[in-house]
Amino acid sequence: MKITVLLLPALALGACAPVYVAPAPPPYHAVGTEPFWNLLIDEHDVTFTQPDAQPIRQPTPKVIHGFAGEIYNTPRINVNIVHGSCSDGMSDRTYLDKVQIRVDGRQFNGCGGL
C-alpha cells in the first residue's frame, strides 16, 4: 500500500510531461540545367519549376529508401536521388546527390542536396 501511495505522485507527474514531436526534416533542393529546372521536396509537397512555366506541385509521398538514395513517386513527378558527388556542368559547385526526375513523362537530370 505504501509503495502504491509513493508511486502515484510520480505517475501523475509523468502524465503531465509534454509529448515529444520530432521536427520536420529540412526541405530538399535540386537543380538542373539545359533546360533549367528546380525541385523542392518538403513535408507537404514535391514542387517542380521551370522558367516561364507553371509550377507542378504534388503531395509529398512516403519516401522509398533505396540502397543508394531515396525515391519519391507521385502521379506526375517521379524523383530518384542517388547519393554521390555531382556537378551541374555550368559552375564549380559540387552537390551531394545526382537527381533524376520524370515529370509528365519528360526526363530531367541534375544535382541536389543543397
Report each predicted region and the residues it spans.
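Sec-dependent bacterial lipoprotein signal peptides
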Residues: 1-16
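Cysteine-centric segments in proteins
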Residues: 17-114
